[in-house]
């Protein structure tokens, strides 16, 4: 390549004309049409023509000549129709040299300007040809369609980033957020980015919008969405992450209305035992509307007949129907301090299926004959018709337990049944339950519930007994069902005496995992030879499944097969795991929100253990575990009770900073 040769190279996606000043060791020193002198490797050159300039004419003259050449070539480029050229040659499917392409395009004698114009045109429009130095290969129609779609997508992406970042800046700079009806796509991109980060399908484009707009990448998207009114300041983000919906599909609501209409018609009671004469009661929380279990007791010989009655949801909810499918997809009701998401539509769970006082209801009744020591002498499980006489809260039941003979008898039997379980190796964790409640005004209350109060203890033990007897009944009758089993703890810290708070809290780390399986193994944690769950069919799908297996033994419906039960175990594993996360994290969030108002206050804490840079401590008043820096200077040991000061709290970022008071 001789000095004076006109060449072209690519700079910022544009062709630039230049003249060679020197060519040495595969490096080319050039003067450009923009009056810049630079050096490139010869492989950087896009085109070299056969026209040469006289370098002796001087720099200014050379630049003017280069600019004139560039103008000529641009005009020639504008005459080229790349699509038309492609339509002529694409069926040949072979490489075509530059000279031949230029002749096809312009006809007649071809100059360096013609060749350059073609190179420029094909460089700018990559849709129809791929090129390699001085030859070109036409893309197939399928390739053209694919490249065109990709180009349109990239253009849309660039527009979204540009428009999105401009709009985000406008929102953040304004006192009142602009209307966002036409910006739903941007909102969804930022929403997905904040919820899922790198797992978001919009991660790359969202990152560009955030960067170009100057938005804080960590909390900026959240603050923006709050300002727009898309989210509240206390938005439950896990509901979005897990795709949990409050509302029921219209088809489910229509199906539930049909069930209500059918439920108000006279119902045949063939095969059901009439137990409406029993003095039956429910004991639940103050705000409960979905009553799914009731208790009765009557003297029998030297002992008692204890009845645990479960609403017969399966009598109405057909297996595989729309209501059942929705309940299956939800897996369980979800209870949080500020929200409740039911498994079944409220018009069913809180009315037709609910064991409401004074209303006849179909039920599955577990009738256990107990001696005075609470040993089960005999039992039967029957489909029944029941009528609740009293609906008590835990609070009211506690007040009446020493005055009402029935409650007193149930309480005494519950205590004795628990003692039987404890002697069989049951592990009774005694930990306070923290009740967090957020009212409609956003006011937070945090209280401790004594799970060992008479009313809670008797309900708990009655339900454990019912679940145990149902497990034995299904096992002994050869009906497959989903059992819950648990091996003994890897290490036992708590003996029969109950243990300290430290021992109870630490014991949880050594518990064996609960296993769902069709094999009726022992549940060591409860001290029982078999166990399942039956008593909450309004709130837990597994309990509804158990109920159907019982009904199968009664001839009321076709039970699930073993294959179907295994599928249910597998299908419910994911929703049950995220429901646990939802409930635990939301409760922790509201406890931290409560503590945000107590910064500077002192709280009692218990040391759990010492780690490298911190102590792990428990705040007994809230039953949450957190860290305490080692730089306090004190030498603390597990079980030490200390006083800590709340330094900083941020519920949104899940941070709680303490110092030794």
Features from the language model and the residues they span:
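N-terminal membrane-targeting/anchoring modules of bacterial envelope and secretion proteins
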Residues: 53-56
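Short, amphipathic alpha-helical interaction segments positioned at domain boundaries
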Residues: 144-168
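Electropositive polyanion-binding surfaces
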Residues: 2-6, 10-16, 23-26, 35-46, ...
